[in-house]
């Protein structure tokens, strides 16, 4: 359940790289318990914005606040209360899943049961499997599990379903929804519009380092239709994703 109390606050964030403005005065708030999406083409500024919020990159000006903590003033405190699932992970192929989770927990000095963490993402039965033997979807689940070892206040997901087939993508969606239902605040980036509609309470559309739209997915679609916009193709009640899922089954194959 979301509340109006913001857990993420961005105020006039700016970041310049020589003659390129990556982030140009971005401001927004993310409510506690909300799933907030950032949409935009490559180079739009969404990744830089996320990195500033995570404390991985300094803004030239503006403020980034996570759970009341100014990121620039105390990045260590911020990193202790966030979980970060990266788009690409460098896990050791020969390590077992429980070993990987335990390793990351030690980095946070978190006292956890690796199997319990794996159970949150449905991988407890694979605790002794080696990373190299996982499917693409299972590797994404593990990367999310690792981001949960410190019981984060905010979970950052960077394109969590990139490269996955429709079956695996739906499984990751179900996992994100489950984490959200347990009260976590989630901020994610994605290139999949259907993913944003499925997961996000609100989305910000970014272009050239600026937010050009911010609302719920339904409201953004309604606003577009009110302009008289007509889709080029007839809108169908099903998609090719649905055809694929119907033919092959919804369960992720190992």
Which ranges hold each PLM region?
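Conserved ABC ATPase signature
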Residues: 130-134
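Conserved catalytic motifs of ABC-family nucleotide-binding domains
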Residues: 151
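ABC ATPase "signature
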Residues: 214-215
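Conserved ABC transporter NBD signature motif
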Residues: 62-73, 77-78
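Conserved ABC ATPase "signature" region
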Residues: 102, 106, 111-126
